[in-house]
Design a protein with these regions (language model features):
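Short Asp/Glu-rich motifs
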Residues: 37-39, 196, 216
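Terminal-tail/helix-coil boundary detector
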Residues: 203, 207-216
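Alpha-helix N-cap and coil->helix boundary residues
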Residues: 65, 89, 185-189, 205
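GST-like fold's C-terminal all-alpha helical module
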Residues: 101-199
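Conserved beta-strand edge residues that scaffold enzyme active sites
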Residues: 32-35, 191, 211
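Basic/polar N-terminal segments that are highly enriched at the extreme N-terminus
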Residues: 1, 144, 214-216
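GST-like domain detector, emphasizing the conserved glutathione-binding G-site
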Residues: 1-126
Length: 216
């Protein structure tokens, strides 16, 4: 397996965590999203993903884009350990939780959106406030949902004592939130999960600072 990745891409970060949880061997092919006008726009990568986005997982003569689709593929390729809770209600909740991040929070502070704002003459302060607004709005809903499932302090991860797709999606989004000085004290349950996950090898090894393309 080859993962086209950028060290700071939240979506690529999700997939790296999932690959590590499943203990699947893979190699990284870095795609720098800023260098040389963005390597994702170069013709050779455009052939791999016409959307010009990372991540892309190449395996069995397939180029699979979209982090959630990649994780679904990994689940089919190697069912255990699963990225989903055994409990049906928690499985549905983890999918809902992941989609809230991947569809409603992350796209609004993706690099190409922020670049569009900057090209529209938005200041750095404007861009930061934009990111903070949408992350805070999303995290407020996530905190409400997850805290209701942890009324008895059940489980160290989002849904129980095993990492799931929800944790794969949450940790990169919190990492991104901290880059923009979002106050995580407002989200104690999310932050508790984040702190626990940071200490786990599968998450630690997937972190931006551990990637070969992380700048010295």
């Amino acid at each position: 397996m080859i993962l086209y990745s950028y060290f700071r891409s939240s979506a690529a970060y999700r997939v790296r965590i999932a690959l590590n949880i499943k203990d699947i061997n893979y190699s990284i092919k870095p795609i720098h999203l800023l260098r040389s006008g963005g390597e994702q726009h170069h013709p050779e990568f455009h052939k791999i993903n016409p959307q010009n986005l990372v991540p892309v997982l190449t395996h069995n003569n397939q180029n699979i884009s979209q982090s959630l689709a990649i994780m679904e593929y990994l689940e089919t390729y190697q069912p255990t350990p699963s990225l989903f809770p055994e409990n049906t209600n928690n499985k549905t909740a983890s999918q809902e939780f992941s989609l809230m991040i991947c569809c409603d929070i992350h796209p609004l502070n993706n690099l190409r959106v922020l670049n569009y704002l900057k090209h529209g003459k938005a200041s750095e302060i404007d861009v930061t406030q934009w990111v903070q607004h949408w992350i805070n709005e999303g995290f407020s809903a996530l905190e409400t949902k997850i805290s209701s499932t942890k009324s008895n302090d059940e489980g160290r991860y989002c849904f129980g004592d095993t990492a799931t797709i929800a944790d794969c999606c949450l940790i990169p989004q919190i990492y991104n939130a901290l880059r923009y000085d979002v106050d995580m004290s407002k989200y104690p349950t999310l932050n508790k999960v984040y702190q626990h996950c940071l200490a786990q090898p599968d998450f630690h090894q997937a972190a931006p600072e551990q990637q070969t393309d992380y700048p010295d």
